[in-house]
Each structure stands twice: as structure tokens, then as C-alpha cells.
């Protein structure tokens, strides 16, 4: 039993748990001289600060506080508790903001201490030494590794299966010691690039570089720990939270002493080459060695010279301005050269210009090599007057005014293979360059295991066209999810990939439109089947969403309009894409939409339009229309539904039905459930989506009809 002394000197006995908080209400009423109401407060159980601070006029009248003066005193005092609470919250917020500010400042100072230069990364070698490497201008993993390999001591170079020393980048790996999981993390290529170019990743000061046949040694791990402790030491200046990190590090050090660290990402080799970015053409032109790391440098230089000359010939013969959108390396370099020359000419005095300048000569494009003589120059001397090579002949001769201009882009007879920039439905996509013209390309490639598989040529085009429907029907029978499944061997799957690639080639030959990726041709070489496609600098809708988040509605309407224009063109050609989704919509750096990946597209003919056969289940599940899921019809209206799903992607940053698995999504779509329309879309945008998601495909509008929708007219930008 607790005893409390009151102001009058009498003892107040509190004998049960219900009245444990009486001292507060009693002191509250005593302070303002209203103790006569104490019994009323106790009877209504208004005894704590939380209950008293919410008192109002009506409650006080109900408690029997009838005097206005008493009510005012009680209310004024109770409201002061709320003010005190708000002041306390504000002070706590200020303290929190000060801590965050000090954390940011300390982190910056820490980074500047550990990584003195902005573009530098510290690599730890297996002998425990460390190398600081400037990665400025290296935008893929191969170029970063290549820059370090040139500085490796001979004893740390990798050896191949024949025991020979190798400097090939694929023979080296990069690890980072993850102290939170106590594992050695084997970095994917994209992880390495991200860490090297991020300003806030402290791992960039302790990357471990080893040959592929080795794992990080104890010396390398020890050096990594020392650098990590320096990081913790810098963090310890921020606040008490760093003490936990220090304690954690001690535990890790103890655990590491007991045994070997576990290596994470052991399955890295499966996707180590995927670097899903499409940099601008001008970016590539300034870092050719980085984007074509496996290409012989002399061959690359020869291609650059020929491309530059080719562009100069056409520019003079046609008197054409150089296109700002060209993907031709020669055009880009010539444009840069002309821009510099023009700036120099404008700075000359007009009188000196007329007397000293010979306008019949074209200035040569020459770039000096960097100070580092060991570094392979990324800027090439394209026109050298002193060069005695056979291919360096002067192209301003007797026939300089007779120029043969190509009417269309021909299939490249020789091309250079660059970095992997993505993957499609079948095979990988690489950056490529026409070795003769310097034109950049995206090359879709799949390995051919069966030598009797050939690429259709113009001579057998008609035969392939006649057999196309039969092959397509057979392919659909194999791929049909709803059909009875048979065991699939690797050979059958591989054959399907090659068939799909040939099918895509047959379709792309017929397509010539601004919003469809351009087809340059195909070839079969070195056990690979290649499709040469237009290189679209920028990226896909899905990659943009991953990088930047959902789009503004005005941008969505702009992209949707272009998608529908491309879809309308396909439908006019009786072609159904069947895989319209964000990953297959490319956006170049000028905002132009390009539809790509026709691996499962279908060309309708009058014959299969009339056939009443079960449709195949083809496409990406979350973008499928009800008639495709139910396998009731194969019509162009499926692309309209998928386009609506892409609009949902752009609004939300996620695919439709993001909370469901593929099987759950199939069930939802099959039971006539439409994707949820974003509540923040405009009324016209919602109406557009409702029309695109019309369940009955016969009433669903066509692409041309949707292009006339008011939503697309209201936001023309």
C-alpha cells in the first residue's frame, strides 16, 4: 500500500491498482486551486496526463465544473500539456536532423580520406598489396578489369589451361568481403560497374582482384579488414551507432580466424556477361576500346579510318549535313572534327582567313594519346598524312566526284563484336560494329549446335516463306502450354531458339517503320546465328522504370502514342507481336519509341484467319489478354490489351498483377479480372485503359481507333 503526503499535510491512502495514478490528477487540481472536483475526476477515471490533456468544455460540464472561471483554469492548464508535447517532438526532430547532417558530413569526409580522387577505386591483389585505379571512362566490367590487368605484376597474372600467362579479362574475378553476412561475394559485372561509379559505396576502396583459378588469400583478406577498420574508424566519429559496427567487426574477425570464408555468388558465370545498358553512340565513340574489349586494336583502328573516310566522301558528294542521330562512328567523329574546325575558323580574322586558309582541303582528325604511354588510346588518329599503310590512300582522286551510294543498309560482311548489352526471348544481344562502315548495331546471337541449320538467304526466301506457316504451327504445338507436355531435351529447346530467330528474321525483312527496330540482315558464322539490328541508344521502358521510377502522365501519353503507331503498322501488315511489354519497348535518347523482339510474333494469313483452331498460349503472362489465356482466339486485339498493360507499367513502375505469381495471374486473367487502373490517372487516362482492357476482344478498339482517343490528343508534347 502506497502513502502520499498532500499539500495540507494529511495522508492520502491509495489501496488498489486503479488509483495508482491519483497523485498526478491531485497535483494537477491543487496547482490551479480546483481540488473540489477531485472526486468527480476519480469517479470518471480521468487521472493520467494523457486523459487530462484532451479535456474540453463539454467534458468539464459533465464532471460538474459549472463555474466558467474554473473551467478556463482547467482547460488552459490541460492545453499546456499538448504544447509541451509538441515542443518536445520538435526538439526530438531537430536532434534527429542534426544527427543525420553530421552523419552525411562524416561520410563525405570518410570517402574523401579513403578514396582521395573522385574516379579512383582501390583493388587488393592476392599478395596483400593494393592498386589504385582510375576508372573514369570505363563503363563496362571488361574495360575496368583491363585497366588493372595492365598494371599487374607478372607473378599475379592468370594462367590458362596450357599453363600460359593470359591477360584476358574473362580469366579474372572480383570479390568483396561482406562483413554483414561474413562471406566473400563474387561480383557480377553489373555490380562491379555500379560500385565503381557510385559515390556512396564504401566497398570501392577494398575490392579484391584475383585470377579465376584462385580465391582471395589470407593476405588479401587481411588488407581488406584493415581498410574496413579505417572505414569504421571514420564512422565512429558520427555517433554511438558505430560502436555496434566495431563490436560486429570483432566478432567477424574471430569467426574468420576459425575457418575459411564462404564464397557467395558461385553461380555467377551463368550471367556474368549481362550488362544491360545501351549508352549513347557518342559515348561509345569516345571509349571504343572499352566497349569492344576483345577486338584487336589494329583492326579497330582500321575500321575507324575507313568509317571516317566513308562519311567524309558522302558528306562532300551529297553536300549533306551530318545527322545528329547517326549511329555511324565515322559520322560522329567527322561531326566532332567539323565542330572544332568551325569554332577555330570563327575565331580567325577575316583578312587572315582569305589569305591563309585553303578551303579545298579537309582538316585531318587527329587526337593525341594520353600521357600514360602504357594505356591503349581510346581516341584514334584516323587520318595521318605520314601513314604509309595501303589502306591510307588519298580518297580525293580522279573519281572523287563519282560516288556509289547504297540504297539500303546491306548485311555486314565483316563486323566487330562488343560488350553484351542485354538478352531477348532467345539468345543474347551484343553491341556490334560494321567493320567496313563503322555503323553501330545490336547483334542478337544464338549458338547453333546442329550444322545443318542454315540461315535463309534471298535465293530461298520464297521457299522459306511458303514453309513459314507450317514451321510456325509446329513450333506452337511444341510451345503450347495447354497441350500435353512431352519431355524436352536440350536439343529440342535449342532447335526452337534457332527456329524462333529465323522466324524473327523473316518478319523483320518486311518491316520498315520509324517505331520498329530496323533489320540490317543476318549471318551464320563460327557456330552462331546472328541477326543484325538497329542500335537504339538509351534503354527499354522497363530499365528506365527501374532507374527513374514511374513516369509523368504527359510522358506516358507520348510513349503510348508512338507504341500504338508502331502496333498499327504491324497490324496493317497482318503481324501480331504477341509480346508487347516494357522490356520490348526501346526508347532512344531523343524519346523515339522502337518496338523490338519479334521472336514469338505471328503473321496472319487469310487461311489461318478462317481456321477455327485452338489458339496457342504465347507471350509474357502478366501482359496476356483473356482470349490468349483461355486460348480461344488469335487476333491483333491481344496487342491492344498488352499495350494497356505497358501503360500500367509506366504509371506504377510495376507490371500488372504485381502481388500475384504467374499461375495466380493466369487464373485472375482467365476469370475476367482486369488490371487495377491507377487512381491518380486523369479521367481520360482511366477511360483509355478501360477501353484497352475490354474483356471481349471483338469490342476492344483497334490501334487506329485508340490513336483517336482524347487522352492521346490532350498531352501532345
Curated annotation (Swiss-Prot):
Serine/threonine protein kinase required for cell-type-specific transcription and signal transduction in yeast. It is thought that it phosphorylates the STE7 protein kinase which itself, phosphorylates the FUS3 and or KSS1 kinases. The active site is at 579 (proton acceptor). Present with 736 molecules/cell in log phase SD medium. Its EC number is 2.7.11.25. ATP binds at residues 421-429, 444. One of its GO terms (biological process) is cell integrity MAPK cascade. Gene3D superfamilies: Phosphatidylinositol 3-kinase Catalytic Subunit, Chain A, domain 1, Phosphorylase Kinase, domain 1, Transcription Factor, Ets-1, Transferase(Phosphotransferase) domain 1. Keywords: ATP-binding, Kinase, Nucleotide-binding, Pheromone response, Phosphoprotein, Serine/threonine-protein kinase, Transferase. GO terms for cellular component: cytoplasm. Residues 20-84 form the SAM domain. Residues 452-481 are annotated as: Disordered. This is Serine/threonine-protein kinase STE11. The modification Phosphoserine is found at residues 323, 465. It catalyses: L-seryl-[protein] + ATP = O-phospho-L-seryl-[protein] + ADP + H(+); L-threonyl-[protein] + ATP = O-phospho-L-threonyl-[protein] + ADP + H(+).
Amino acid at each position: 500500500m502506497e502513502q502520499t503526503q498532500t499539500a495540507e499535510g494529511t495522508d492520502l491512502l491509495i489501496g488498489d491498482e486503479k488509483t495508482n495514478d491519483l497523485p498526478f490528477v491531485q497535483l494537477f487540481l491543487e496547482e490551479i486551486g480546483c481540488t473540489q472536483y477531485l472526486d468527480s475526476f476519480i469517479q470518471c477515471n480521468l487521472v493520467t496526463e494523457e486523459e487530462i490533456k484532451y479535456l474540453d468544455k463539454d467534458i468539464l460540464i459533465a464532471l460538474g465544473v459549472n463555474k466558467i472561471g474554473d473551467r478556463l483554469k482547467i482547460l488552459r492548464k490541460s492545453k499546456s500539456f499538448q504544447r509541451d508535447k509538441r515542443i518536445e517532438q520538435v526538439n526530438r526532430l531537430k536532434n534527429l536532423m542534426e544527427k543525420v547532417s553530421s552523419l552525411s558530413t562524416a561520410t563525405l569526409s570518410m570517402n574523401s580520406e579513403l578514396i582521395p580522387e573522385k574516379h579512383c577505386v582501390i583493388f587488393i591483389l592476392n599478395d596483400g598489396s593494393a592498386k589504385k585505379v582510375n576508372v573514369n571512362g570505363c563503363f563496362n566490367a571488361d574495360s575496368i578489369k583491363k585497366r588493372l590487368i595492365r598494371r599487374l605484376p607478372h607473378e599475379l597474372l592468370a594462367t590458362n589451361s596450357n599453363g600460359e600467362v593470359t591477360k584476358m579479362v574473362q580469366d579474372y574475378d572480383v570479390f568483396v568481403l561482406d562483413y554483414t553476412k561474413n562471406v566473400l561475394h563474387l561480383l557480377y559485372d553489373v555490380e562491379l560497374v555500379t560500385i565503381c561509379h557510385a559515390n556512396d559505396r564504401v566497398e570501392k576502396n577494398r575490392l579484391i582482384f584475383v585470377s579465376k583459378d584462385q580465391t582471395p588469400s589470407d593476405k588479401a583478406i587481411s588488407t581488406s579488414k584493415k581498410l574496413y577498420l579505417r572505414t569504421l574508424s571514420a564512422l565512429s566519429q558520427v555517433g554511438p551507432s558505430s560502436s555496434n559496427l566495431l563490436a560486429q567487426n570483432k566478432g567477424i574477425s574471430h569467426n574468420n580466424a576459425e575457418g575459411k570464408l564462404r564464397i557467395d555468388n558461385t553461380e555467377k558465370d551463368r550471367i556474368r556477361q549481362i550488362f544491360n545498358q545501351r549508352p549513347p553512340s557518342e559515348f561509345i565513340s569516345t571509349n571504343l576500346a572499352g566497349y569492344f574489349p576483345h577486338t584487336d586494336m589494329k583492326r579497330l583502328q582500321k575500321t575507324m579510318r575507313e568509317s571516317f573516310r566513308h562519311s567524309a566522301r558522302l558528306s562532300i558528294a551529297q553536300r549533306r549535313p551530318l545527322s545528329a542521330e547517326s549511329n555511324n562512328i565515322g559520322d560522329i567523329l567527322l561531326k566532332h572534327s567539323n565542330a572544332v574546325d568551325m569554332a577555330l575558323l570563327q575565331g580567325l580574322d577575316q583578312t587572315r582567313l582569305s589569305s591563309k586558309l585553303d578551303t579545298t582541303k579537309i582538316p585531318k582528325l587527329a587526337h593525341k594519346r594520353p600521357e600514360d604511354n602504357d594505356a591503349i588510346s581510346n581516341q584514334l588518329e584516323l587520318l595521318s598524312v605520314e601513314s604509309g599503310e595501303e589502306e591510307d590512300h588519298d580518297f580525293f582522286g580522279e573519281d572523287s566526284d563519282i560516288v556509289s551510294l547504297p540504297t539500303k543498309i546491306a548485311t555486314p560482311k565483316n563486323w566487330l563484336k562488343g560488350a553484351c548489352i542485354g538478352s531477348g526471348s532467345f539468345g543474347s544481344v551484343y553491341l556490334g560494329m560494321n567493320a567496313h562502315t563503322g555503323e553501330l548495331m545490336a547483334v542478337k546471337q544464338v549458338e547453333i549446335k546442329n550444322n545443318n541449320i542454315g540461315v535463309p538467304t534471298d535465293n530461298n526466301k520464297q521457299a522459306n516463306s511458303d514453309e513459314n506457316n507450317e514451321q510456325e504451327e509446329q513450333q506452337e504445338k511444341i510451345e503450347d502450354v495447354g497441350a500435353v507436355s512431352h519431355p524436352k531435351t536440350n536439343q529440342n529447346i535449342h532447335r526452337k531458339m534457332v527456329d524462333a530467330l529465323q522466324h524473327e528474321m523473316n518478319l523483320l525483312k518486311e518491316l520498315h517503320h520509324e517505331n520498329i527496330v530496323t533489320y540490317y540482315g543476318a549471318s551464320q558464322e563460327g557456330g552462331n546465328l546472328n541477326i543484325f539490328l538497329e542500335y537504339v541508344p538509351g534503354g527499354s521502358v522497363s530499365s528506365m522504370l527501374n532507374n527513374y521510377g514511374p513516369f509523368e502522365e504527359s510522358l506516358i501519353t507520348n510513349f503510348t502514342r508512338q507504341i500504338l503507331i508502331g502496333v498499327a503498322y504491324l497490324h496493317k501488315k497482318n503481324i501480331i507481336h504477341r509480346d508487347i511489354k516494357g522490356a520490348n519497348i526501346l526508347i532512344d535518347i531523343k524519346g523515339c519509341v522502337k518496338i523490338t523482339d519479334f521472336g514469338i510474333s505471328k503473321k496472319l494469313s487469310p487461311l489461318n484467319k478462317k481456321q477455327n483452331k485452338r489458339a496457342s498460349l504465347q507471350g509474357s503472362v502478366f501482359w496476356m489478354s483473356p482470349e490468349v489465356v483461355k486460348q480461344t482466339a488469335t487476333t491483333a486485339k491481344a496487342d491492344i490489351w498488352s499495350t494497356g498493360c505497358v501503360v500500367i507499367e509506366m504509371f506504377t513502375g510495376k507490371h500488372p498483377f504485381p502481388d500475384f505469381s504467374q499461375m495466380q495471374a493466369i487464373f485472375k486473367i482467365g476469370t475476367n479480372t482486369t488490371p487495377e487502373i491507377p487512381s491518380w490517372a486523369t479521367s481520360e487516362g482511366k477511360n483509355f485503359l478501360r477501353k484497352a482492357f475490354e474483356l471481349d476482344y471483338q469490342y476492344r478498339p483497334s490501334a487506329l481507333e485508340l490513336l483517336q482517343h482524347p487522352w492521346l490528343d490532350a498531352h501532345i508534347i
